[in-house]
């Protein structure tokens, strides 16, 4: 039946797996909860199961898969296959994720790279970045990732961790980010922090229809905030305006630094 390939996106909320043929045609896809608070072996098992399900859904077996692409958030030692301290994964500290996944998948070759970089390169080769040689890519989800294509090549940096665009500081001494810095764009404009700011506002006594959601579910999601924006909620508008402003500042700063032909957005918030 021919060879097929697996691409895994390890996100802070979901693991997303795609199964492709050699011409990059998507044959099947699977999404499963990451359970980022769990230990590394649980996260690896979740990735492996989602991969096997994706291949089965496409009508193939794992014997037809010569290699697996794994995109993970940084910082990491990508050439060594080690996640050092991924911001939204509290248990992943100096974890040999490439070896662990390869062992679980019976020795499959694992190509390990920054999640935003591989998404950026995918858009450059086959998506919204086709036709340009210089582009900036943002992925908006639990966190904010980035990738930069310069003169047709992916910018990796001296330590493989270039283009951590979500951790560009846009408000000095601002909100505390999960990375430990204050004022990062991610601390304002990511899905998790959009929801967090709305929750904090409600807890401080601001009025909003979101209060019913918080009381019922015990939490608010980014989708909840945007759903209530559509319904005309004033707090939701305030929060999403702040998110949009943070993204605009981030884009302007990145534009001045890189002068891209195109800026591409992707991720769960899009």
Region roles according to the model:
Residues 138, 158-159:
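Short Gly/Pro-enriched turn/cap motifs at secondary-structure boundaries
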Residues 161-164:
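Structural signature of FAD isoalloxazine-binding scaffolds in flavoprotein oxidoreductases
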Residues 9, 69-73, 113, 137-143, ...:
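Short beta-strand segments
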Residues 88-91, 111-117, 137-140:
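Active-site nucleophile and cofactor-binding loops and adjacent substrate-binding regions
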Residues 30-32, 87, 158:
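Short hydrophobic alpha-helix segments
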Residues 81-93:
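A charged helix-plus-loop insertion that forms the helical arch/lid used to bind
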Residues 149-150, 154-158:
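Catalytic-core segment of enzymes that process non-peptidic bonds
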Residues 1-67, 76-82, 99-109, 122-132, ...:
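ATP-binding/phosphotransfer module of carbohydrate and carboxylate kinases, centering on a glycine-rich
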């Amino acid at each position: 039946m021919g060879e097929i390939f697996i691409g895994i996106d390890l996100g802070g909320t979901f693991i997303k797996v795609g199964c492709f043929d050699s011409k990059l045609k998507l044959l099947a896809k699977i999404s499963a909860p990451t359970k980022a608070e769990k230990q590394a072996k649980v996260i690896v098992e979740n990735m492996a199961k989602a991969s096997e399900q994706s291949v089965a859904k496409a009508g193939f077996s794992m014997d037809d898969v010569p290699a697996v692409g794994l995109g993970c958030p940084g910082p990491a030692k990508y050439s060594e296959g080690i996640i050092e301290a991924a911001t939204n994964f509290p248990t992943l500290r100096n974890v040999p994720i490439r070896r662990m996944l390869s062992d679980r998948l019976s020795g499959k070759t694992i190509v390990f790279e920054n999640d935003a970089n591989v998404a950026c390169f995918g858009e450059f080769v086959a998506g919204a970045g086709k036709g340009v040689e210089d582009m900036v890519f943002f992925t908006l989800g639990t966190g904010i990732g980035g990738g930069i294509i310069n003169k047709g090549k992916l910018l990796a940096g001296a330590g493989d961790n270039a283009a951590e665009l979500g951790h560009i500081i846009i408000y000095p001494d601002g909100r505390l980010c999960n990375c430990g810095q204050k004022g990062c764009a991610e601390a304002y404009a990511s899905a998790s922090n959009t929801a967090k700011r709305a929750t904090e506002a409600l807890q401080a006594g601001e009025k909003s229809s979101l209060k019913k959601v918080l009381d019922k579910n015990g939490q608010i999601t980014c989708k909840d905030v945007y759903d209530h924006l559509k319904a005309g909620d004033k707090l939701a508008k305030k929060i999403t305006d702040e998110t949009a402003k943070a993204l605009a500042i981030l884009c302007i700063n990145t534009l001045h630094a890189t002068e891209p032909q195109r800026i591409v957005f992707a991720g769960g918030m899009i």
